[in-house]
Amino acid sequence: MTSLAILPQLKRTITDIMDEELYQSPSSPNSMTSFPSGTGNLMSNTNHNTFNQSNNTPFNMNYNHISNRNSINSSPNLSATTFNNANNLGNVLNIPDSFLEQLASQDYIDHLKSQQQQEQAFENPDDIYVQDVHENQVNPFNDYGNPDSFIRAQEQQSQLPQPQQPISQQDKQRPQSQQQQATKAPLPQAFPTRRRRKITLLNDIGGSSTRKKHFDEDYLLYNPDISPGHIVTDCSLDSSLVIPPNSNELFLTESESPEFANDIIPGYENDYLFLDDDDEQIEEDVSDDEGDNYFQVDEDFDDYLMNNNGYDGYPTFNNYESSGNNTDIINNNNNIVDETISDANSNSELEVVFDQPKEVSPSAISPASPDSDDMMIDVEDETEIADATAAKEEINKKHSKSGKKESKSQKENQLTTTTKSKKHSHGISGAEITLNNPNHQCNLINPSTGEPCNKQFSRPYDLIRHQDTIHASMKKIFRCVICEGRLNGGPGNGKEKTFSRGDALSRHIKIKHGLVGQDALDLINEAKENVEYIPV
């Protein structure tokens, strides 16, 4: 069984409802009653609250009259009460088009509020206290969000609700407030000028002429008593601003000139080191007895070595080890040269050099091999080296022509010397050493540690001098006859002052004893002639 339902006809279709009506809220019963502002009847406190709420509602909202008209006209069935609510609702939902419009409307609202408060204060003279108008109202702008607060702070403070006071007191304060408004301070600047400190000069200290100026030296950045003229005229030696001149005759009196005889500044005597005061310490700093520093430059000796065909006559490469085919060929050629040289030299001299006791007399040592690190070369040594070189060349020519072999007995007698000579080459130049050993590294065994030395040098000359001193089988000793008291003969004073190298002795004579020129050269040559050898 089917049932048939008859629905009433719709008054309006969905197309008649506008978009604005969907966002309208139903009318509130509190806003149904409205009272005119000009009524003269006395009302209770409740009626006053309702009256204030109904009149203040449009003042708390933002205005946009264009949108309000559209929303009202689209609904023909709205009542008068709904009309007012819709007008207020449109103001809430619509945002002002510009900030200037909002700012102007806010100023206008504040002005109306101030007038309304004044009217309400005089409309009810029978009331003991005036009701707080802003009791239930919330300002949409707080102190931090209101853009007008920073330039109208004083005006807003005057408009804020004051605590409840009797009307008699308000009548007394009214002329005072009017007088204060007449004498308002100007609005503060957006960027106020900052106070800056005044620069006080030294002449400004003191204030008055009667008061004596007092300078606190702890707070002054400079001494006001010093001027360029003061420094020029004041030549006191005690002043820290005066630098003694190089010439002792300028600006110095006769009594002050001897103080600068040795270029010593008075008051700084302890900063100078005198050689006579500390003998042993200065000798340790200057001399190279330990053989740790081998980078002293001796240009004269280097020039001599390069201009006289290498290191002939110097026991330089007794333990020099080289690798490669080039070094093997050189060693084979040198073995032949060494064997022929041994024929020319007597066997007794070789036995003296290598089989000698701890100390050997100077006469028993042949002077054919001068010191490798002498700073000065004697003329006699140069002639001996040249003779030895010429003898080697003649022997090489004879040996190449004859081609005879040496006897076994001669080889056995010279076994100790030839084995050591195989490790080095007397005729190798600095260029050949650099070619075979670019880093100038010493591959010999360190006698003190028993491990390879592996020291590297910047020049072949430094490598040769290192091997002649550190890795030499016989250590050279040069004596200073001045320190030992044997300068003019005699037994001496019992002291020993020895050096392992000739350049260290020459520096000692020049620095310690102050000898230069021919006197120093004579002592150095005498020490070379009397050089001593001690087995390591």
Swiss-Prot record:
Induction remarks: Expression is induced by HAP43, by osmotic stress, by oxidative stress, by heavy metal stress, and during biofilm formation.
Gene Ontology cellular component terms for the protein in this record: nucleus
C2H2-type ZnF: 440-471
InterPro entries documented for this protein: Znf_C2H2_type
Ranges of Basic and acidic residues composition bias in the record: 393-411
Disordered: annotated segments: 154-196, 353-375, 393-434
Protein name per its UniProtKB record: Transcriptional regulator RPN4
UniProt organism field: Candida albicans (strain SC5314 / ATCC MYA-2876)
